[in-house]
């Protein structure tokens, strides 16, 4: 089951509650929403976080990371994963938010990414900033990379309301989002 999380916008710049990401095929979601933080996020040592370039080579690298980051078959085949990242970049899931679409790199290699859009096409999150996906390479999890990406993306969007969806059984992702002030909707 998918959970949708929303973090409502507030004027004091502090977080209000947990969040989530889109689930795979057949999943159900609850909405989580939250307010972005204004303080810079902590970053794991040796990890660089920067904007994702929308050139073909960069999008393909992020698509391959997306494919590797999920269990076999969950992201389809590699070409489908790349096509999904391309579709996000092209605006199929809302307007790409360049300052919040970020990649974490270690030694020049991508180890995690967050894809964020504005005004996604789904009725329950219309008008929100929306975290389309957050993914970290399997061997790099548990080091704070996902949390650093979420924190950096939230800082980039200011005090806008942010939503996302996450699989209910994905406890690690839920903890990341809840630490950043998101709550189930």
Please name every model-derived segment:
Residues 48-67, 71, 75:
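A short beta-loop-alpha structural element at the N-terminal edge
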Residues 1-53:
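Acyl-donor-binding surface of acyltransferase catalytic domains
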Residues 70-90:
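Conserved GNAT-fold acetyl-CoA-binding loop/helix
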Residues 133-136, 142-156, 174-179:
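Conserved acetyl-CoA-binding loop-helix of GNAT-fold acetyltransferases
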Residues 16-18, 177, 182:
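Conserved active-site tyrosine of GNAT-family acetyltransferases
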Residues 119-131, 141, 160:
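A conserved beta-turn-beta hairpin within the catalytic core of GNAT-like acetyltransferases
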Residues 6-14, 138-141, 163-174:
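Conserved beta-strand-loop-alpha-helix junction that forms the acyl-donor binding cleft
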Residues 101-103, 109-118, 130, 135:
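Conserved beta-strand in the GNAT
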